[in-house]
């Protein structure tokens, strides 16, 4: 089948190199359904001009329940329950893996050693052996050429084990930290899967559906699938809330092989008849734990109910809590599982963790001292992500830093979508190497090369602490996490000390003393629920940053420090 993609007609995979205008324009560096992809007159004007274009807000303060502006109430009530007659469904191909002779000849002892050396654990029946090189994975030439062009030296651990699992057509669970290379672990087999299926006919929905918790993650996935699906002319679109529906609807009506979506907006499209999931035979749930954290479980269940039961399903998660296990048990069949690293709550050991016990009034001065050290020299490429406990503190700190000459911008749920996109782009490109964020706004953001995380306010629990500091030290790099810890946080001292000890980090004696006298922290998800306020209270300027470019992000830099 893979040779059957001629030009012409609806089914032909012609068109501009994998991807419609809705989503990230890699050449122009913009989101062309929201503003001009080359910074034109109706977008982010070049050279620092302001923004045009509206872009729907988040509704209801923050995420409207999660996932980039998706509304949560009564979603999916209009979807009809499907009764599948399996005998009437067209057959499809999902098993493509042919073991390379080098892999077949490896002894069980050699396989065990490779897995142990790379912290790979596998579970399930007849799990295929891992591959050690790209050539051993057995991808077709059109995929391998794209991979080699990227200059990767070897597959990551999750790719070594995950590719044979995914290509075999089995249902797969993969547990690995963000930044481990999991996106390519499911994207490349997805391309092979698509090229083995009949071409789309008018009215057909996608063949591959990828669900993600946030629009930021969805766009990042789209960038990968566009890059590697280019030679196959595979079309894709990104479907997420917080932006106009028109461009997304146009993409779906023209036909796309891949749909990357947040759950709420996808259900909206399904209920309004703009697409259907009858052709989906390859389903991916990315960051499943985050989707459940954000309250998407009912929507995920409704969406999966619209997809044929004999599909291939791949679920990816950074953690493996009971809720994720239940979802896997309900929707995956005889699945095989790969875990990378420990399943215990643990921090990435490549991250240097510095925890300083401070008073609330000391935080600003300490932050400036760290910034002076981190940002020393104009040539350095450091990027710093600063976490705060509330949106108001995020704006306060951003305002304070900009008035002190630091190129900081803030991102949180009260910002409109186009401002969030712009801030993220400024941070990614290094034009603004300091980004201040709240926990919710940061979910799903995968910015490479963040060198430092600074926890201005300590989060509500150890799991959030580990997720925060995990923004640095990705994909094999080293990172540094600096955390301000006050006596108000003392109930969490014992749990934090445990995380630091596990990662063999130095512990501030005052923190150790707090841990001895503080009592329990309420377990992994419980414990102290935060102060609510916190952070700098200095009375410069008004409230938050508002819904367009304004507030703290609009302040000019005074006497630029960097």
Curated annotation (Swiss-Prot):
Q: Which locations, inside or outside the cell, does it occupy?
A: Cytoplasm; Nucleus
GO cellular component annotations, sorted alphabetically? cytoplasm; nucleus; ribonucleoprotein complex
Biased segments, Gly residues type: 536-550
Where can the motif DEAD box be found?
Answer: 286-289
Question: Where would I find the Helicase C-terminal domain in this sequence?
Answer: 370-515
Record's Pfam families?
DEAD, Helicase_C
Chain residue ranges for the region called Disordered: 536-562
Read off the SMART domains from this record.
DEXDc (SM00487), HELICc (SM00490)
Notes concerning its domains: The Q motif is unique to and characteristic of the DEAD box family of RNA helicases and controls ATP binding and hydrolysis.
Tell me the protein's name: ATP-dependent RNA helicase dbp2
Phylogenetic classification of the source organism: Eukaryota, Fungi, Dikarya, Ascomycota, Pezizomycotina
Q: What gene, per UniProt, encodes this protein?
A: drh-1
């Amino acid at each position: 089948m893979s040779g059957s993609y001629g030009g012409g007609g609806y089914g032909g995979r012609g068109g501009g190199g994998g991807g419609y205008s809705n989503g990230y324009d890699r050449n122009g560096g913009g989101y062309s359904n929201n503003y001009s992809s080359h910074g034109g007159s109706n977008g982010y004007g070049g050279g620092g001009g302001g923004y045009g274009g509206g872009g729907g807000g988040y509704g209801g303060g923050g995420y409207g329940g999660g996932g980039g502006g998706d509304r949560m109430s009564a979603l999916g009530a209009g979807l009809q329950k499907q009764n599948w007659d399996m005998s009437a469904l067209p057959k499809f191909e999902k098993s493509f893996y042919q073991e390379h002779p080098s892999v077949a000849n490896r002894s069980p002892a050699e396989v065990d050693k490779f897995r142990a050396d790379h912290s790979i654990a596998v579970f399930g029946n007849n799990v295929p052996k891992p591959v050690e090189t790209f050539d051993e994975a057995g991808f077709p030439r059109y995929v391998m050429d794209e991979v080699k062009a990227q200059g990767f030296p070897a597959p990551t651990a999750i790719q070594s084990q995950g590719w044979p699992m995914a290509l075999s057509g089995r249902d797969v669970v993969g547990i690995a930290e963000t930044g481990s290379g999991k996106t390519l672990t499911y994207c490349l087999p997805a391309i092979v899967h698509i090229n083995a299926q009949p071409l789309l006919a008018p009215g057909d929905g996608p063949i591959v559906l990828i669900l993600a918790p946030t629009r930021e993650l969805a766009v990042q996935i789209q960038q990968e699938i566009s890059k590697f699906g280019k030679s196959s002319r595979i079309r894709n679109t990104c479907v997420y809330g917080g932006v106009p529906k028109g461009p997304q609807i146009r993409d779906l009506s023209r036909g796309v092989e891949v749909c990357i979506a947040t759950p709420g907006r996808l259900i909206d499209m399904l209920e309004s008849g703009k697409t259907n999931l009858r052709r989906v035979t390859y389903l991916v749930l990315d960051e499943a734990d985050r989707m459940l954290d954000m309250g998407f479980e009912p929507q995920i269940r409704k969406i999966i109910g619209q997809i044929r039961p004999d599909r291939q399903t791949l679920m990816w998660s950074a953690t493996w809590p009971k809720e994720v296990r239940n979802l896997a048990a309900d929707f995956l069949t005889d699945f095989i599982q790969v875990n990378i690293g420990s399943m215990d709550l643990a921090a990435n050991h490549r991250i240097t963790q510095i925890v300083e016990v401070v008073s609330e009034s000391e935080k600003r001065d300490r932050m400036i001292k760290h910034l002076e050290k981190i940002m020393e020299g104009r040539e350095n490429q450091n990027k710093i992500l600063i976490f705060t406990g509330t949106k108001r503190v995020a704006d306060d700190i951003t305002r304070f830093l900009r008035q002190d000459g630091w190129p900081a911008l803030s991102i949180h749920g009260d910002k409109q979508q186009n401002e969030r996109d712009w801030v993220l782009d400024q941070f990614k490109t290094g034009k603004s190497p300091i980004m201040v964020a709240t926990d919710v706004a940061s979910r799903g953001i995968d910015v490479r090369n963040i060198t430092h995380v600074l926890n201005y306010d300590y989060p509500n629990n150890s799991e959030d602490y580990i997720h925060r500091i995990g923004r640095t030290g990705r994909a094999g790099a080293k990172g540094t996490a600096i955390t301000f810890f006050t006596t108000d946080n003392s109930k969490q001292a014992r749990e934090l000390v445990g995380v630091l000890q596990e990662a063999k980090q130095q512990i501030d004696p005052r923190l150790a003393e707090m841990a001895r006298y503080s009592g329990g922290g309420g377990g992994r998800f419980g414990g102290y629920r935060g102060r609510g306020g916190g952070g700098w209270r200095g009375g410069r300027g008004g409230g938050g940053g508002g819904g367009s470019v304004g507030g703290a992000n609009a302040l000019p830099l005074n006497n630029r420090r960097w």
